[in-house]
Amino acid sequence: MAQPRIPAARGAAASLQAQNGAASASGSPYTNGPVHNTLMSPQVSSSQGYDSQPPGSYPRPMPAKTLNPFSAQSNYGGSQGSGQTLNSPLVTSGPVLPSLHSGPVPRMPLPTSQNPAATPMPSGSFLPGANPPPPLNWQYNYPSTGPQTNHFPHVAPPTLPGNPNLTADHQYVSSGDPALQTSFKKPGSALPLQNPPLPPTFQPGAPPGPPPAGGPPPSRGPAPQKTPPRAAPPPSFNSAVNQEGITSNANNGSTAAHNTYDEIEGGGFLATPQLVNQNPKTSRSVGSAYPSLPPGYQNSAPPVAGMPPPSLSYPSGPQAFTQTPLGANHLTASMSGLSLHPEGLRVVNLLQERNMLPSTPLQPPVPNLLEDIQKLNCNPELFRCTLTSVPQTQALLNKAKLPLGLLLHPFKDLVQLPVVTSSTIVRCRSCRTYINPFVNFLDQRRWKCNLCYRVNDVPEEFMYNPLTRVYGEPHKRPEVQNATIEFMAPSEYMLRPPQPPVYLFVFDVSHNAIETGYLNSVCQSLLDNLDLLPGNTRTKIGFITFDSTIHFYSLQEGLSQPQMLIVSDIDDVFIPMPENLLVNLNESKELVQDLLKTLPQMFTKTLETQSALGPALQAAFKLISPTGGRMSVFQTQLPTLGVGALKPREEPNQRSSAKEIHLTPSTDFYKKLALDCSGQQAAVDLFLLSGQYSDLASLGCISRYSAGSVYYYPSYHHQHNPVQVQKLQKELHRYLTRKIGFEAVMRIRCTKGLSIHTFHGNFFVRSTDLLSLPNVNPDAGYAVQMSVEESLTDTQLVSFQSALLYTSSKGERRIRVHTLCLPVVSTLNEVFLGADVQAISGLLANMAVDRSVTASLSDARDALVNAVIDSLSAYRSSVLSGQQPGLMVPFSLRLFPLFVLALLKQKSFQTGTSIRLDERIFAMCQVKSQPLVHLMLTTHPSLYRVDNLSDEGALNINDRTIPQPPILQLSVEKLSRDGAFLMDAGSLLMLWVGRNCSQNFLSQVLGVQNYASIPQTMTDLPELDTPESARIAAFISWLREQRPFFPVLYVIREESLMKAAFLQSLVEDRTESALSYYEFLLHIQQQVNK
C-alpha cells in the first residue's frame, strides 16, 4: 500500500539554498552535510550532487494518528521557512566546497552509496525501499567520497597475542595536565604504588648497542627522489586546498612548508626511512619519552555514572605482538565463539518479555574478534560503531534496515593517556593513516596499512623500542600497542607558532540582565577560578559589555584602575586601543580582579532596555581575530538593535504545529559570523539566561558553526530561582577549568570500501572530510553516517581512525588518535547480532533533529517509528524461520522500541504545546553535541530506589564507598508510597518521596520529622552525620561527576509542582499525548505483521 508523499518533501530542490545555507561568490554552497570530493569532481555546477526527484511512495504507512491519541497534536504538514543567503563567504585558496555542521534536508534515511542516479528516498522513513535500493542518506545525494585514492591488494591484519615483560625504569608523559610523579621499579625492587600517577618526561639515550647480529635486513626499493620545496604562501586559516592524499611523498623526512591545516593533517611530515648512520652508537639518539606501561587508561578511570564498568576486553597494558596473518581458519574460530554467548543468539518476544531493561548500566556489545585483537581495541566510551559487525556489502546493509555510523567522544578526559614524543610520527605514505595496533608487519622493515593496504617501510628510528630498550621490535612500540595514543607534534604540523590561550568575555548589561543578577554570579565565579584557567604565561583575557552601546575595558599594565571605553555607533563598530583590551593575565591580574569586583555595581541603576548583541559580537570578533581563542557570550533577552536584531516568533498555542513551529534561524547573520570566527580559529560559547523567548534557533548558530557550546538557563533569577544560580555556578566552574584545545582539526579515516558522507556535531566542515574545531573540549561528542561504497568481500576486518590535531593550553601541538577495528560479516543474522542499540538510537536522534528542522516534527517522529518497524520487519522476514506470533526481535535489539519511544517523549520530539520553543531547540542542541552516554541518559533516564541503600555490591573509589542500587523500569508500577526513588535524567535529578516513606529515611536523610515537613522547594539534601545520609550523598556525588551539565536536585512530594515532570519521564507509561510502552509494542507488531 503506497503512502502519500509528505508535504514537507515537496519543493526540496527549489528550497535547497534555503536549507543548506547560501552560496558563496564562487558558486560553492555553504551546506550542512556532505560535499563533493574536489579530487574527483573539480568542476562544480549549480545543481551538482543534488537529487531533485520527488520522493517515491513508501510501502508501509505509519499514520501519526495511530501514535497519538490526540491527532490534532500530531499531524504536521508543510515545509519550514527558508533560510537566508550568505553574502561574504570565507576566503579560500582553491575550489573548495565547505560544509557546515550536519546539513538537514527533507529526507533522512540511513547511510548508503551516494549514487546520483539511484531511486529517490521515500520521505516518511529513514530506510530504503525494497527494490531497487535507493540512496540512504538524510541529505541530498552527493557522490560519496571514499577516504582513500590508492587501492592495494589486501593482506589480512595481524593477530596480537601476548604481553611483554617490562623490567626497565620507564616514565609517562602527562596528557596535558600538570605532571604527577612516580616511578616503576625493576624486578626485585620495592613494589610500585597503587594507582601510580604520571612522572615527567624522560628522554632515553641511544640504544645500548648495535643492532642484533644476523642476516641483512630485507632489501628496500630506492628512496624516491626529493623535489624542490614549495614556497609557502601566507597562512590562510580558512583555506583547505589540498585534499586527502594530495601531498608530496618525496620529502622523505625533510621539513616541508604547509599553507593549510588540511595539508598538515592530511599530508604533513612523512615518516619514511632516512639516510642515517647504521651504527646506533654514532647516530643521534632515537626514540623519545614513552609511557612506561602504555597504560590501560580504559580501565584506570573510576566508573562514570550511567556507563557500564570497564570491560576486561580492553587493554590494560602493553600487549605482545605476534605477527601472524589472520586467515580463514582464524575467522572461523572467531565465529564459532558465538556459541559461547547464547544470550546473543536469543530471539525475544517483547509482548511476553517486557522487562528487558538490565538492572545495571547497559554495556555496549563486544565485537566478535579474536581476544588478541579485541584487547587492543578502542574503548567504546571514545569510539563506537552502530554495527559491531560491518556488513560486507551495501545491499546487505540495506537489507538490515539499520544505520551504519560512528559516535565519537575524541577529547574525553582520560586519567592516563600514552603520549609519544618521538620526532618521527609513522604514517601511511598513501592514505596518511597513523600506525596503530591493527597494521600488519610483513617483516621488521615493512608494514601494511590496515586502511588502504599500502606496504610502507619502517623508519630506522621506529626499530628501537625505548620501553624495552631493544632494537628490532617495532611491533612492541607504544604506537602499535595502544588504540588510543597522543603524539607531540613536531614543527611540521604547525602553520604558525601555537596560539596563546585567549579568553574574551562578552556580557549583556541591559536593564533586564541586571535584574536577573547573573553578573554577580559570573564575576564571582571568574574571580574564584581565575588562577585555574587553562593556560600558561602567555594567557590573555579581555572583557566587553553591551546594552544599546558597546563598552570596552582597557587593562593596560601600569593603570591604577580599568578604563571604560564606550562605542555608541553600533552600525560601524571599531576597536579603540586594541592593544590594551586583550592583555596578559599574569601581567594585569590585579586590574582584571578589580574589574570583576566592580563590574556588577557599575550598571545597577541602568534603565537601558535595548540589546545590541550583533554589533557586540562583531566587535568581539574584530578584537579576537588576530590570535583566535574563545568567546564566552552571556545574553538575557532577544537582541533588538543593530545587525542580528530579532523579532518574537513563538506562538504559545502553536508550539508544535508543522506550519508555525520555528526551528530554523530567522537570519543568517549569526551563521555568517560563526564562519568568520571559525576561519580565525575563534569559537563562541553562548550562555542564554532568559525567561522570555530569545530565538535560540537563530542565536545558537553562532556556537554551532564555530565549534562552541550552548548553555541555557530558563527563568534565571538570583532570588526567585536559586536552583538555576547553583547550576550556573557549578557549570561555570567546569567550563572555566576543564581542559581545552585550540585551533583544532579532526579527520576520520576508514578502510577502503567504506565511505563517510554526513557529520553531526558543532563544527565547520572545512574540506571533504576535515572538521574545523577552533576549540575542542572534553564534553563534546560527534557522530557520522557511513555507507559501504565497495564490496568488502576481500577483507575480514575493517578499521576506523580519528585523528584530532590541536594546540594544548600549554602551547604544545598534539595529535590524539583513536583506532577501532571491527569484523566484516556476510549474513544478515550476524549483522543483527552485532547491533549496538544505544549507538543506533543516538545516531537516529541526530538524524531526526535534522529532519525536524528541514521537514517537520511529524516527519521526524514518523521516521523514528519507521526505523523500528523496518528493521524488525527485515529480521522477521529474512532471519526468522517461519511466522511466529508476537513481536520477535533479536536480543541485541530488545531495547530498540523502548529507546525510540523514549526519544518520541524527549523534549526534542515531544508533541503538545507545553514545551517552550527555546527549550525544544536547546534539547536539540544537546542531541547534536553531547557524547552518547549523556545523550542516552537524557533520553532514557535511570530510576533507582534509594531509601534502602546498602554497601552490598558498592564501588570503592578513592576511599569512597559508592552504593550501586539496581536500575528500575521507568513506570509508575515500580514506585511505591513507602519508598523513595531517585531519577537521573542527565541534567536533572529528581528524588520522589512516597507519602508513607519510612521515618528512618525522613529523619536520617532528609532531616525532617514527618512527611508534611518536607519543604515544597527542597533542592539540597542536608549533610547529616548518619550512614544513610553519607551513602546517598556519595551516590549523588558520583552521578554528578564528569557531566557536561550540572544536574540539579529536586526533592518531590506527591503535591509538588515538579511531580508532573517526574511522571512525564516515566516513558513506559501513557501520557495525554503519547502511547504507553505496551501500546507502542502493539502498534509496532501490527505494522511488522503487515
UniProtKB/Swiss-Prot annotation:
Spans annotated as Disordered: 1-260, 272-325
Main location: membrane
GO biological process, one term: COPII-coated vesicle cargo loading
Region of interest: Zinc finger-like: 428-452
Keyword annotations from UniProtKB, A to Z: Cytoplasm, Cytoplasmic vesicle, Endoplasmic reticulum, ER-Golgi transport, Membrane, Metal-binding, Protein transport, Transport, Zinc
Compartments where located: Cytoplasmic vesicle, COPII-coated vesicle membrane; Endoplasmic reticulum membrane; Cytoplasm, Cytosol
CC per GO annotation: COPII vesicle coat; cytosol; endoplasmic reticulum membrane
InterPro entries according to UniProt: ADF-H/Gelsolin-like_dom_sf, Gelsolin-like_dom, Gelsolin-like_dom_sf, Sec23/24_helical_dom, Sec23/24_helical_dom_sf, Sec23/24_trunk_dom, Sec23_24_beta_S, SEC23_SEC24_subfamily
Polar residues composition bias: residue spans: 29-55, 138-151, 162-184, 237-258, 274-286, 313-325
Top-rank taxon: Eukaryota
Paired cysteines (S-S): none
Topological relation to the membrane, as annotated: Peripheral membrane protein
Bias-annotated ranges (Pro residues): 194-236
Gelsolin-like repeat boundaries on the chain: 963-1036
Positions contributing to Zn(2+) binding: C428, C431, C449, C452
Segments of skewed composition (Low complexity): 8-28
Single annotated GO MF: zinc ion binding
Gene3D superfamilies tied to this protein: beta-sandwich domain of Sec23/24, Sec23/Sec24 helical domain, Severin, von Willebrand factor, type A domain, Zn-finger domain of Sec23/24
Record Pfam families: Gelsolin, Sec23_BS, Sec23_helical, Sec23_trunk, zf-Sec23_Sec24
Family the UniProt entry places it in: Belongs to the SEC23/SEC24 family. SEC24 subfamily.
Subunit structure, interactors included: COPII is composed of at least five proteins: the Sec23/24 complex, the Sec13/31 complex and Sar1. Interacts with TMED2. Interacts (as part of the Sec23/24 complex) with SEC22B; recruits SEC22B into COPII-coated vesicles for its transport from the endoplasmic reticulum to the Golgi. Interacts with STING1; promoting STING1 translocation to COPII vesicles in a STEEP1-dependent manner. Interacts with TMEM39A. Interacts with SACM1L; this interaction is reduced in the absence of TMEM39A.
Free-text function comment from the UniProt entry: Component of the coat protein complex II (COPII) which promotes the formation of transport vesicles from the endoplasmic reticulum (ER). The coat has two main functions, the physical deformation of the endoplasmic reticulum membrane into vesicles and the selection of cargo molecules for their transport to the Golgi complex. Plays a central role in cargo selection within the COPII complex and together with SEC24B may have a different specificity compared to SEC24C and SEC24D. May package preferentially cargos with cytoplasmic DxE or LxxLE motifs and may also recognize conformational epitopes.
Full protein name: Protein transport protein Sec24A
Organism the protein comes from: Mus musculus (Mouse)
Gene designation: Sec24a
